[in-house]
């Protein structure tokens, strides 16, 4: 199969994660929120390229009909599970100091968290990301990386070494950490350290 771009891989990973969690694929809107794309037409474009490259098949008459093909299909049926560490707690409202101790581990499909030593989970406390579908008490799946594209949801350390989950923007002479809550103001910083990118969300419905 033809190699995927980083964005296409992120979208494919998110689709596989949702199929594993729910038994059916995510909506275009959910995909856009997960990978930091505001335009549904841009998401459709990436899905078309995934289809052209043979990774997925879509039914144009059904909005959620995304079938994973080839080896990736087997990954969603029978695969190994990796115990991903849940690391402390990060506030999605007012930033709190990042806790580096591992509280527990959470099982996730190996295909979703390729490079398990670079993936961790954090529990959200606060309501600043509710418009991105991330709520108080959710667990976010984070891939460790030190850079991000504008619009991606990241775990970042502020100038005061505080950890927070926000949408990332690098602007002319500063960084903007944007909450997904219209009642809250962005955090404007001269310096920021990206810890990782949020690639998925887990919510207990009980």
UniProtKB/Swiss-Prot annotation:
Source taxonomy: Bacteria, Bacillati, Bacillota, Bacilli, Bacillales
Catalytic activity: Hydrolysis of Ala-|-Gly bond in repressor LexA
Entry similarity comment: Belongs to the peptidase S24 family.
GO biological process, one term: SOS response
CDD domains, per the entry: HTH_ARSR, S24_LexA-like
Gene name as annotated: lexA
GO CC entries: protein-DNA complex
Function: Represses a number of genes involved in the response to DNA damage (SOS response), including recA and lexA. In the presence of single-stranded DNA, RecA interacts with LexA causing an autocatalytic cleavage which disrupts the DNA-binding part of LexA, leading to derepression of the SOS regulon and eventually DNA repair.
Domain of life: Bacteria
PANTHER family associated with the record: LEXA REPRESSOR, LEXA REPRESSOR-RELATED
Full protein name: LexA repressor
Subunit comment: Homodimer.
Species the sequence originates in: Bacillus cereus (strain ATCC 14579 / DSM 31 / CCUG 7414 / JCM 2152 / NBRC 15305 / NCIMB 9373 / NCTC 2599 / NRRL B-3711)
DNA-binding region as annotated in the record: 28-48
Top EC category: hydrolase
Active site: 128, 166
Molecular function per GO: DNA-binding transcription repressor activity; sequence-specific DNA binding; serine-type endopeptidase activity
Annotated site residues (Cleavage) in this chain: 92-93
InterPro entries from the UniProt entry: ArsR-like_HTH, LexA, LexA-like, LexA/Signal_pep-like_sf, LexA_DNA-bd_dom, LexA_repressor, Peptidase_S24_LexA, Peptidase_S24_S26A/B/C
């Amino acid at each position: 199969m033809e190699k995927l771009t980083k964005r296409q891989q992120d979208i494919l990973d998110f689709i596989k994660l949702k199929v594993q969690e729910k038994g059916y694929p995510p909506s275009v809107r959910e995909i856009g929120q997960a990978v930091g794309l505001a335009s549904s037409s841009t998401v459709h474009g990436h899905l078309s390229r995934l289809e052209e490259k043979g990774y997925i098949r879509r039914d144009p008459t059904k909005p959620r009909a995304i079938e994973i093909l080839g080896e990736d299909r087997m990954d969603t049926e029978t695969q190994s599970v990796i115990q991903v560490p849940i690391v402390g707690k990060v506030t999605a409202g007012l930033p709190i100091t990042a806790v580096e101790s591992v509280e527990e581990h959470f099982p996730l499909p190996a295909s979703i968290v390729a490079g398990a030593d670079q993936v961790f989970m954090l529990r959200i406390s606060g309501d600043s990301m509710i418009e991105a579908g991330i709520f108080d008490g959710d667990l976010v799946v984070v891939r460790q990386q030190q850079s991000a594209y504008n619009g991606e949801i990241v775990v970042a350390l502020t100038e005061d070494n505080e950890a927070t989950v926000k949408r990332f923007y690098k602007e002319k002479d500063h960084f903007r950490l944007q909450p997904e809550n219209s009642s809250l103001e962005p955090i404007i910083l001269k310096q920021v350290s990206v810890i990782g990118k949020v690639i998925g969300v887990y919510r207990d419905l009980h």
